[in-house]
Amino acid sequence: MASRGNRARSQPVDNTISYVQCDGLAAMKMVKHCHEESLNNMEVAQGALLGLVVDDRLEITNCFPFPKSDETIDEEEYQLNMMRRLRHVNVDHFHVGWYQSADVGNFLSSTLLESQYHYQTSIEESVVVIYDTQKSARGFLTLKAYRLTPQAIAMYKERDFTPEALRNLKVGYENLFIEIPIVIKNSALCNIMMSELTELVPEEEGTHFLDLGTASVLENHLRCMMDRVDELNHEATKFNKYQQAAIRQEQEKHRMLAKHAQENAARIAKGEQAVPEEEVNKLFRPIPVPTRLNPMIVSGQINTYAQHISQFCSQSLAKLYMTQALQNAKDNKQ
C-alpha cells in the first residue's frame, strides 16, 4: 500500500487546464439527457461538450447528445452537422470534450479510457465530464471533470499493457485520471430569476432528508462490488496460470540446455562440430503475457465502490443518530 501511495504522489502534474467553468444551461442539458436515458433504457448517456479555452480555464458553454448506438447515423457526420448549425446561430462551436453518465457512481472502463485518449491526442485541452445519476437523484449534484495523466497517455501510445511496461511507467488505477475542479456559472439575469423562484417554492418540513429506506442503494453497490471482485479473482487466476506455465517452460528449457551442453561436449570429444543453442531455443515459443489493463480497471472500480459504500454508510449512520435524537425529544415531550 505504501508503494502505491508513493507512486501516486510522484506522478507528473498536468497543468494544461487548471479548472473547468460550466454554464448552467450546459449543466442542465447534461442532467436532463442523463436522467432521460437512465429512466428509459438504463443505457449510458454520452454527448459532446462545446466551448472555448481562455488561458488555463476551459469554458463549457453548450452541449448536445450523441446519437444512440442502434441508430444508423454516422456519428462524426452528425457531430459536424450539429456544430455547423450551432455556429450559424452564433453559439460556441469548438469541441472541448465530451460527457457521460456514471453507472452506480462508477465510470472507469476501457472504452472510456480509449475515447479520452483519442480526445486528448486530437484536442489537447479536452476533458470528460462524468454525471452520477443515482447520487444526484438523492440530492447531491455530482458533476466531475477528468483528464488522462501523462503516464496513461504514454501507456496508450505504447500499447503495451504487460506487467513490466506498467511497472516502468508507474501506472496504476490511482493515477489514470486527474480530476479537474469544475464550477457552474450563471449570468446575472439567471441568478435573479433563481432568487425569485426560491421565494415561490413552498417550504419543506425536511422530513424527506431523514428517509432511512436506503437498503436498496447499499444492496446495489454491494452487488456491483461483488461482481467486480469475482471478475478480479478470475483475472488473478488467469495470470497465475500464465506464471505457472512460464515457470514450467523455463525449467524445461534449462533441462534441455543442460542436456544439449552434455551432447555438445560429447561431440567435441569425438571431434564433431557442436550444435548451436538456437536449435533448442526454437523449440520454446514465448508464452503470450495476459494484458494487465482490465485487472487494473477492475481494481479501480472496486476501490470506487468501496469509497461510495463507506461514504454512504457514514451518511446513513448520521441519519440514524439524528432520528434517534428526534425520537427521544418527542418521547420527552409526551
Curated annotation (Swiss-Prot):
Pfam families documented for this protein: eIF3h_C, JAB
PANTHER family with a match to the protein in the record: EUKARYOTIC TRANSLATION INITIATION FACTOR 3 -RELATED (PTHR10410)
Keyword ATP-binding: no
Gene3D superfamilies according to UniProt: Cytidine Deaminase, domain 2
Signal peptide from the UniProt entry: none
Family statement: Belongs to the eIF-3 subunit H family.
Localisation per UniProt entry: Cytoplasm
A single Gene Ontology CC term: eukaryotic translation initiation factor 3 complex
Chief location of this protein within or outside the cell: cytoplasm
Domain called MPN: residue spans: 20-152
MF annotations from Gene Ontology: metallopeptidase activity; translation initiation factor activity
Protein name: Eukaryotic translation initiation factor 3 subunit H
InterPro entries in UniProt: eIF3h, eIF3h_C, JAMM/MPN+_dom, JAMM_MPN+_peptidase_M67A, MPN
Reported function: Component of the eukaryotic translation initiation factor 3 (eIF-3) complex, which is involved in protein synthesis of a specialized repertoire of mRNAs and, together with other initiation factors, stimulates binding of mRNA and methionyl-tRNAi to the 40S ribosome. The eIF-3 complex specifically targets and initiates translation of a subset of mRNAs involved in cell proliferation.
Summary of subunit composition and partner proteins: Component of the eukaryotic translation initiation factor 3 (eIF-3) complex.
GO BP: formation of cytoplasmic translation initiation complex; translational initiation
Keyword vocabulary terms for this entry: Cytoplasm, Initiation factor, Protein biosynthesis
